[in-house]
């Protein structure tokens, strides 16, 4: 590291300490006489050099701990991304807790094309069924930083899901002093959350912490509740200049669903049988009395599927990680990691009597032990599996070269079943009769064996003013699915085994960072990526075994940008062009080598996006260091490049990708121990289908928080704080998450109404 960077880092650390004690940062600068070297931010704004990605060759931004702790207690790590430039995050509720209500898009990519890591442990795929979505694995209170690269993450980060974007979650190391924190939150919709963490302190190089959080609340839309129990732990043993770290996460989650609705249902023009409309459109909290549609079957009416107890989700996830870091000599550093994950869970969805009767008749003469349907069916899907892997990375500083190389190996085994069962009396409120299967739909196992390695060289030239990254990675994923993938497999008495390998041995990444001076940088990058096809299990379950598997989606990403890090402001602006090829789409076509027409997933073309992103923070001196501003602005045009089947979509906008995204906020620290923030988030209109025949309006929501007690202690507690968070202050009524379609009206999840949360915390 250059001497100037060391000096700048030391001054910034000093500034952070002073802010924590309540003294204005600008006063420190004047006293020390080093205002030219000091970057001024605020105690609730991310550290400047981290926030704008200083020294990174790609557009990399971050949320540091100070900003994370200002969010509502219990907010998911995924929803926090909405404060970063370019990330269109939609959530079904204010905390982002409901898993099937979350969506993310950035540049040309969606949630399943983004790579997520926790302390360098790859999260694999983000599917709610069988995947490892990041929001199950973190509590905000334990995070040190969330770093996101919207275009292309570093070539050394392991992921088979990413077509470029990478989001990395880094947790805290255990505190060297014994202590802890407890907090309790109450909020709208009967929300209650408790968090507790105990740091064990350091003893002969050993340190560690354990934490737990317990959250319970009602759905804001309709009957039902959410319940989550979450535990984390970390042990660290420092050995000389190296360290061994063990960490674990356990998550137990249960919730009821809420329905997606069309614009017609939202507007009340769909002729809903129960008179529902607007954003409060929900499942029923009672069993209605409906006309019988099949003689002798009391609960044969299809509308009985609107009872809320027929739509639930439950997940249990366990993750264990072990990391060993050590220097080897004076120039080499080795990092070894291993992890193991196990999961299980289930989901319930209803099936109408008429549908179940047809499926029962199709299978009853082939599969023994089936029972005729009695009414509404209990649809049970179960998931279980394990994921295990190892990572290794070696870095070597050799003159102007900083060399690194590494490997990642992973095995992912996943098992899924799906059956329909009778319920007592056929009633939607009857207990499930798991000894009376009506028909079978799935019982398969899928595996993914991944091998990835990378090599990278960072050259420091021109007296360390120019840094050039030259690297590449090789990725290979062997996939297999075997068993009963769909009802047709049961009917045909077949248990196919289908395999496919996706690999690319040369995926380059090139980047450069040039220091114009000690405050300004220019950066640029180019990268190529390949990813496991999104929803691979669904792809290979959609048709007969004769249908061919698709090629992997691939991408290219170009970026060029500028960063400024000044005494009273910092900013980053980047222009980009990104695309991905071999886009996947299901449609009817003749299966190659036969005359049979089937609907199966095929590679149908490309998506390209271009645009610009700005991120900045400003703390003007003329306001006495008590007020600071932050803002992100993104402009993005994402378009289809090719038609498919009979749909002329070339040149059409990709649905759910807004053209404009803006977030901004102002933070006011009037006195020591008090922080007030007001922020806004605007998303422009979005198309909702491929042919662009429908769109949903843009919206702006305002949020605020008041934090009191910073620096206040009493009795055994070093710090006692109170925080109030208000989300959607003006109670904006809008449609958020979109379930896109090809050429028909889409379905939506309404955005949550105004919510208020109170949190009291104490540290000891």
Where do the language-model regions lie?
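Short acidic/polar hinge/loop motifs at secondary-structure boundaries
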Residues: 104, 122-150, 170, 264-266, ...
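N-terminal periplasmic "start-of-domain" segments of outer-membrane beta-barrel proteins
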Residues: 37-72, 103, 126, 148
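Acidic/polar loop-and-plug regions of large Gram-negative outer-membrane beta-barrel proteins
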Residues: 236, 243-321, 348-379, 431-434
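Extracytoplasmic beta-strand/coil segments of soluble accessory domains associated
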Residues: 78-122
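Short strand-turn segments of transmembrane beta-barrel domains in outer membranes
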Residues: 150, 165-200, 210-222, 679
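A beta-strand signature from Gram-negative outer-membrane beta-barrel systems
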Residues: 36, 137-181
């Amino acid at each position: 590291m250059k001497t100037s960077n060391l000096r700048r880092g030391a001054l910034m650390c000093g500034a952070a300490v002073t802010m924590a004690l309540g003294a204005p940062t600008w006063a420190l600068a004047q006293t020390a006489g080093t205002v030219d070297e000091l970057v001024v931010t605020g105690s609730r704004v991310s550290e400047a050099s981290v926030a704008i990605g200083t020294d990174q060759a790609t557009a990399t931004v971050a949320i540091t701990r100070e900003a994370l702790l200002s969010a509502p207690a219990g907010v998911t790590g995924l929803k926090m991304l909405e404060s970063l430039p370019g990330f269109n995050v939609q959530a079904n509720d204010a905390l982002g807790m409901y898993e099937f209500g979350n969506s993310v898009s950035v540049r040309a990519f969606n949630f399943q094309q983004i790579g997520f890591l926790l302390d360098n442990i790859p999260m694999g795929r983000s599917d709610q069924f069988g995947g490892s979505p990041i929001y199950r694995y973190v509590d905000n209170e334990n995070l040190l930083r969330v770093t996101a690269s919207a275009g292309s993450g570093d070539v050394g980060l392991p992921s088979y899901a990413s077509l470029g974007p990478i989001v990395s979650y880094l947790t805290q190391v255990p505190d060297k002093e014994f202590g802890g924190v407890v907090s309790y939150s109450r909020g709208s919709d009967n929300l209650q959350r408790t968090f507790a963490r105990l740091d064990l302190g350091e003893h002969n190089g050993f340190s560690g912490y354990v934490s737990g959080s317990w959250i319970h609340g009602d759905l804001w839309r309709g009957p039902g509740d959410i319940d989550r129990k979450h535990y984390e732990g970390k042990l660290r043993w420092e050995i000389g200049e190296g360290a061994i770290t063990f960490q674990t996460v356990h998550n137990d989650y249960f919730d009821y669903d809420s329905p997606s609705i069309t614009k017609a249902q939202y507007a009340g023009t769909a002729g809903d049988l129960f008179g529902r409309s607007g954003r409060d459109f929900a499942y029923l909290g009672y069993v209605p009395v409906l006309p019988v549609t099949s003689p002798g079957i009391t609960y044969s009416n299809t509308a009985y599927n609107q009872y809320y107890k027929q739509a639930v989700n439950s997940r249990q996830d366990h993750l264990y990680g072990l990391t060993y870091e050590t220097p080897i000599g004076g120039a080499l550093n080795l990092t070894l990691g291993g992890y193991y994950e196990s999961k299980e869970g289930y989901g319930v969805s209803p099936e109408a009597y008429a549908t179940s009767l047809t499926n029962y008749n199709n299978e009853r003469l082939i599969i023994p032990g089936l029972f005729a349907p009695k009414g509404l069916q209990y649809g049970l899907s179960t998931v279980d599996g394990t994921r295990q892997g190892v990572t290794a990375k070696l870095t070597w500083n050799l003159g102007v070269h900083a060399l690194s190389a590494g490997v990642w190996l992973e095995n992912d085994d996943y098992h899924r079943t799906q059956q329909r069962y009778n319920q007592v009396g056929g009633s939607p409120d009857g207990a499930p009769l798991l000894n009376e299967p009506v028909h079978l739909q799935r019982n398969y196992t899928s595996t993914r064996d991944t091998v990835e390695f990378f090599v990278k060289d960072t050259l420091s030239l021109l007296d360390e003013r120019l840094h050039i990254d030259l690297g590449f990675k090789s990725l290979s994923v062997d996939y297999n699915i075997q068993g009963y993938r769909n009802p047709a497999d049961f009917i045909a008495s077949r248990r196919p085994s289908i395999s496919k390998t996706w690999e690319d041995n040369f995926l380059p990444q090139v980047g450069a960072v040039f220091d114009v001076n000690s405050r300004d940088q220019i950066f640029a990058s180019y990268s190529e990526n390949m990813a496991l096809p999104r929803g691979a299990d669904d792809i290979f379950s959609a048709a007969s075994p004769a249908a061919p598997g698709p090629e992997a989606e691939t991408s290219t990403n170009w970026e060029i940008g500028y960063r400024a890090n000044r005494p009273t402001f910092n900013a980053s602006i980047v222009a980009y062009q990104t695309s991905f090829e071999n886009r996947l789409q299901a449609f009817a076509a003749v299966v190659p080598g036969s005359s049979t027409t089937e609907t199966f997933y095929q590679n149908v073309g490309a998506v390209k996006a271009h645009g610009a992103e700005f991120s900045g923070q400003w703390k003007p001196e003329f306001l006495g260091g008590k007020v600071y501003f932050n803002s992100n602005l993104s402009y993005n045009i994402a378009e289809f490049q090719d038609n498919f089947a009979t749909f002329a979509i070339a040149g059409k906008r990709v649905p759910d990708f807004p053209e404009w995204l803006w977030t901004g906020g102002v933070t006011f620290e009037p006195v020591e121990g008090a922080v007030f923030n007001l922020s806004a988030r605007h998303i422009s209109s979005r198309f909702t289908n491929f042919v662009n025949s429908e769109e949903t309006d843009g919206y702006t929501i305002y949020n605020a928080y008041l934090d009191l007690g910073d620096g206040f202690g009493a009795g055994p507690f070093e710090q006692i704080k109170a925080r109030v968070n208000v989300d959607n202050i003006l109670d904006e009524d809008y449609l958020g998450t979109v379930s896109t379609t090809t050429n028909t009206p889409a379905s939506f999840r309404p955005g949550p109404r105004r919510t208020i949360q109170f949190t009291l915390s104490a540290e000891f």
